[in-house]
Structure formats: structure tokens, C-alpha cells
């Protein structure tokens, strides 16, 4: 069973967070990391250390695992074809989701499948979105379906 999980990491100035190997995308919602500024994202699959800048950082982190997690902001079981190649893709304020994933409202409010979601509230994709809000999401797409559309970050994953 594959799970996609979203975490919200609130890092104090200079604080570090060690991450185990595994497919992930990190998005800096505010502040900065040593190598990434607010509004930017990065894909990674190796061990990593996130280090907050002088003002700290709020980091949204999506991780793909083969198990369930209890400590995530939101976790969703994702059915994937074990024989297909996939990629994790991070996008902001895009149209319909190209695959299953998890989104997070950054500013404003969105109505997601009839439910009001406020800033830093999370939702499972695909979903029907309406309202005046800004969001970021990570979706899983088949590698052959990656198009030229702009992504904040993306990378191949191996199941």
C-alpha cells in the first residue's frame, strides 16, 4: 500500500531537520532554508538535512512511503500500478489535478468538494475546487504523462 503524506514543519532560526531516504518534495511556505527560498520547492530521494535560515521557516513536505503514517497533517492511500513509472510533481494554483495527490491552501479560502478549507488546511486530490485562494499541491503522474507545463519541482519515483 502506497501512501502520500503531507507534513508541516515549523523550523526555528538555524534549526535542522534530518530526512531519511525516500521520494519527497519540500516547499518553503515562509522564511527560507539554507538552499531554498519562500515560494520555491525541491524534489529529493536521498537522505537530506533541511536547515532553516535566520528567520526560521515553515516547510510543507510531501513524502511517498509504502506504509501508513500517523503524525502527518494529511495522509492518503494511493493506488498505483506497480509496473508503471511515476513522477512526483509540485504545482501552484493549477487547473485540474493530473493525478492523485494532496494540496494545501496557502492564502485565502477554498471550497474543496463542498467543504471550506482555510490557510494551511489540506485536501486530497482529485477534488473540485472553488473560491479565492492560493494553494500548492503534489500529485503523482505517470512518467509518460509529464507535459511541458511549469512545475515548481518534479522528479521520478521508484516503487
Where are the regions that the model predicts?
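A short glycine-rich, His/Asp/Glu-containing loop-to-beta-strand
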Residues: 1-22, 62-101, 143-145
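A short hydrophobic beta-strand segment most commonly corresponding to one strand
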Residues: 2-5, 55-73, 124, 133-155
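Residue "hotspots" at secondary-structure boundaries inside conserved domains
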Residues: 9, 17, 26, 34, ...
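Short, conserved beta-strand element in jelly-roll/cupin
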Residues: 21-34, 98-111
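Short, surface-exposed beta-edge/turn micro-motifs
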Residues: 22-25, 56-57, 99-102, 119-120, ...
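Intrinsically disordered, low-complexity linker/propeptide segments enriched in Ser/Thr/Gly/Pro
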Residues: 27, 39-40, 91, 135-138
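Short acidic-glycine-tyrosine-enriched beta hairpin
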Residues: 32-50, 111-129
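Cys/His-clustered metal-coordination modules, chiefly Zn-binding fingers
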Residues: 157-159
Amino acid at each position: 500500500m502506497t501512501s502520500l503524506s503531507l507534513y508541516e514543519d515549523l523550523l526555528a532560526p538555524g534549526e535542522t531537520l534530518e530526512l531519511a531516504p525516500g521520494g519527497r518534495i519540500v516547499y518553503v511556505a515562509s522564511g527560507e532554508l539554507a538552499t531554498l527560498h519562500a515560494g520555491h520547492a525541491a524534489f529529493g530521494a536521498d537522505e537530506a538535512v533541511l536547515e532553516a535560515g535566520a528567520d526560521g521557516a515553515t516547510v510543507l513536505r510531501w513524502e511517498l512511503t509504502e506504509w501508513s503514517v500517523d503524525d502527518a497533517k494529511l495522509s492518503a492511500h494511493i493506488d498505483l500500478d506497480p509496473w508503471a513509472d511515476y513522477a512526483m510533481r509540485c504545482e501552484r494554483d493549477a487547473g485540474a489535478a493530473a493525478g492523485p495527490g494532496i494540496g494545501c491552501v496557502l492564502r485565502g479560502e477554498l471550497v474543496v468538494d463542498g467543504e471550506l478549507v482555510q490557510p494551511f488546511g489540506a485536501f486530497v486530490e482529485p477534488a473540485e475546487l472553488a473560491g479565492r485562494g492560493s494553494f500548492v499541491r503534489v500529485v503523482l503522474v505517470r512518467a509518460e504523462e509529464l507535459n511541458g507545463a511549469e512545475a515548481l519541482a518534479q522528479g521520478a519515483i521508484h516503487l
